[in-house]
Design a protein with these regions (language model features):
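A short, N-terminal "cap"/entry segment at the start of jelly-roll beta-barrel domains
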Residues: 1-45, 130-132
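Conserved short histidine dyad/triad with adjacent acidic residue
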Residues: 31-65, 79, 87, 99-103
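Structured binding elements
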Residues: 71
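Glycine-centered positions in the ABC transporter ATPase nucleotide-binding domain
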Residues: 75-76
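Active-site pocket scaffolds in enzymes
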Residues: 82
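Ligand-binding loop in jelly-roll beta-barrel domains
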Residues: 100-125
Length: 132
């Protein structure tokens, strides 16, 4: 199965418009979809998005999902593990690549942050389960 995304050449992004709170996220965290579509019910597709945390925004629980995730922190601070367990604080130019099934988070940001994320189901494996 091929990865399907619209062909987009360089174009300006309007960072003031087109943001929405993703399902299951608290207010203060918003996404802007740049390309693709991820269908979590059919376990197909991919998406590229920006995710931003306002200053003080936080999630309350760890995340786990059945698709690959790549995350690059463009600006600001991101604190991982804000659940009474060990925490790590990351700044710009940090990157994570997570296979399906990896627990991560919860997250918070003291000053706010902007993340570039790519999510995708592995088109080469049945059910997209990671076999690593």
């Amino acid at each position: 199965m091929a990865i399907r995304k619209e062909h987009l050449e360089f174009h300006p992004l309007d960072l003031a418009l087109g943001w929405r709170t993703p399902a299951g996220y608290p207010s203060g965290i918003e996404e802007k979809i740049l390309a693709g579509a991820l269908d979590e019910k059919a376990k197909t597709g991919n998406r590229t998005r920006l995710l931003r945390f306002e200053a003080g925004a936080r999630t309350s629980l760890p995340f786990v999902h059945d698709y690959w995730e790549e995350v690059y922190l463009l600006s600001g601070d991101l604190i991982v593990g804000d659940d009474g367990k060990a925490t790590e604080t990351y700044g710009p130019n940090t990157y994570a690549c997570r296979p399906p099934g990896v627990h991560h988070g919860p997250f918070r940001s003291t000053d706010g942050c902007l993340l570039f994320e790519i999510h995708y189901y592995d088109p080469g494996s049945a059910g997209s389960a990671w076999r690593g």
